[in-house]
């Protein structure tokens, strides 16, 4: 495929986060981040959650130590997102503030160390 050729229509990527316990991760994302549990494969080795326009997130059981994942999430109303996640009990490791690079941003960490940078221009 040449540089100017357009790729055929494909969907957006689906992240797969490494976790020590898939079921625990699903419950955390439901309770602390407002996600809906999608499915849990028999044997509890892989499962998924979803949230509005964000689409699904897959979890796969891994034996620690593993390298946590980092995701950037655009929030249309960053103030409302911050307050909502704070009220749900999300582990906000960096509060909402304007960063030197110009974004208003806050960071949430899950129990397995995966990070989500919620931001707005």
Positions of the model-derived regions?
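Short secondary-structure boundary/capping segments
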Residues: 5-7, 38-39, 47-49, 61-64, ...
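Residue-level marker for the onset of beta-strands and adjacent loop->beta junctions
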Residues: 13, 45, 69, 102-104
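Vicinal oxygen chelate
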Residues: 21-22, 71-115
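Amphipathic alpha-helical segments
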Residues: 23-36
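Short secondary-structure junctions
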Residues: 34-40, 92-95
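Conserved short beta-strand elements that form part of the metal-binding/catalytic scaffold
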Residues: 36-69, 115-120
